[in-house]
Design a protein with these regions (language model features):
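Short N-terminal edge-element motif at the start of the domain
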Residues: 1-30
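Long, hydrophobic, amphipathic alpha-helical segments used as structural scaffolds
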Residues: 23, 27, 118-121, 125
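Short, hydrophobic/proline-enriched secondary-structure or compact coil segments at domain edges
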Residues: 35, 110, 117, 136-143
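Polybasic, proline/glycine-rich intrinsically disordered low-complexity segments
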Residues: 53-122
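Soluble secreted/lumenal catalytic domains
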Residues: 41, 80, 117, 157-163
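Glycine-rich, aromatic-bearing surface loops/beta-hairpins
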Residues: 126-170
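N-terminal interaction modules that seed assembly of large macromolecular complexes
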Residues: 25-62
Length: 170
């Protein structure tokens, strides 16, 4: 991956953390946050949506961010959009293989961010420390548009295989 792209994804990670810290605590107890709707048409890399849901609002959609109480947190999108525009500009004219490598790189970055955030939550610290969270809270990648194998892979990569199985996500 290009150094400039890696640097931008470092800035994306920093902005995710700072935005989570600034977001007001939702009413209720949050059991999950997730990134979903990762978009790429090989000319533009879109900002994935950030969502969360609270206990009592899960019904049949417990792991379906598009149905959660907050399916798109606009503040996260707005703060990440300029960085994603820069990534897309750096990728202009690249072939499909380069874009596919970028998509995989993005998933790896987001998986690592989620694993790190999950660890900080378990220790009672980090950018979500001001939210009311369940004991088994997770933040992960819940990419509903992916096929089942890719969905399962991304969930396990972002929340850990043990948590994914214990919570019945996969």
């Amino acid at each position: 991956m290009q150094k400039e792209v890696e640097s931008l994804f470092g800035a994306i990670e920093t902005r995710i953390h700072s935005t989570l810290q600034r977001l007001p605590a939702p009413e209720g107890v949050v059991y999950a946050c997730g990134f979903w709707l990762f978009y790429c048409d090989y000319t533009v890399l879109g900002v994935p949506c950030f969502a969360y849901n609270t206990v009592g609002n899960e019904n049949d959609t417990k792991w379906s961010p598009s149905e959660w109480i907050v399916d798109v947190a606009d503040e996260m999108t707005e703060v990440l959009k300029p960085l994603y525009e820069q990534v897309s500009s750096l990728m202009a004219g690249k072939d499909d293989a380069a874009w596919e490598a970028l998509i995989e790189y993005q998933w790896n970055v987001y998986s690592k961010v989620c694993i790190s955030l999950n660890a900080s939550v378990k220790q009672g610290r980090g950018p979500l420390a001001h939210w009311y969270l369940t004991e088994d809270f997770v933040i992960g990648i819940f990419e509903e548009q992916a096929d089942d194998d890719m969905y399962d892979f991304l969930v396990k990569a972002s929340v850990g295989e043990k948590a994914a199985l214990e919570l019945g996500i996969v």
